[in-house]
Amino acid sequence: MYTSKQPFLKSKQPFRKSKQTFNKSKQTFRKSKQTFRKFKQPFRKSKQPFRRRPRIGPGDRIDYRNMSLINRFISEQGKILSRRINRLTLKQQRLITLAIKQARILSFLPFRNYENEKQFQAQSISIITGSRPRKNRHIPQLTEKYNSNRNLRNYNQNLRNINRNLSSD
């Protein structure tokens, strides 16, 4: 009989973890790490020669009157290009945007480039309409077919009604 006052007996054999599973997982991790290192090295080498020169030189002054500089940072539609595209520092981008806005207000620059914007809109509209199938409801052949189907349905409905009336009489 078991009573609550009896002490808990420890087993004589200690609890052992299986070391094999742990070692296997370690080995697979090492293998994957080695293959990752192999692929990592050639990418580092290829990036070095593609370093580009910044668009703003050391002598360039960021000002609303410097139109040749400002025009480099405006898109074809007249929008201010992002920092990622311009490759500018945050301070330079802020100064450029302020200069562009100032030039627009003082009418040195248009707010939008309407000629390029119209071409852009025409291209985007043609792309949208080209991908979607159009529904032409006003083609005479389709409307005749639709009307004939509707007439057939109405005729069948009338026949059913007549049959009901006859059966009830």
UniProtKB/Swiss-Prot annotation:
Composition bias type Basic residues, residue spans: 27-55
InterPro entries, A to Z: Ribosomal_bS18, Ribosomal_bS18_CS, Ribosomal_bS18_sf
Cellular component terms (Gene Ontology): chloroplast; mitochondrial small ribosomal subunit
Domain of life according to the entry: Eukaryota
Cited SUPFAM superfamilies: Ribosomal protein S18
Pfam families referenced in this protein's UniProt entry, alphabetically: Ribosomal_S18
Any GO molecular function: structural constituent of ribosome
Region named Disordered: 1-61
Locations listed in the record: Plastid, Chloroplast
Gene3D superfamilies assigned: Ribosomal protein S18
Major subcellular location class: plastid
UniProt keyword annotations, A-Z: Chloroplast, Plastid, Ribonucleoprotein, Ribosomal protein, RNA-binding, rRNA-binding
Gene Ontology BP annotations: translation
Subunit annotation: Part of the 30S ribosomal subunit.
Family of this protein: Belongs to the bacterial ribosomal protein bS18 family.
Protein name: Small ribosomal subunit protein bS18c
Source species taxonomy: Eukaryota, Viridiplantae, Streptophyta, Embryophyta, Tracheophyta
Encoding gene (name): rps18
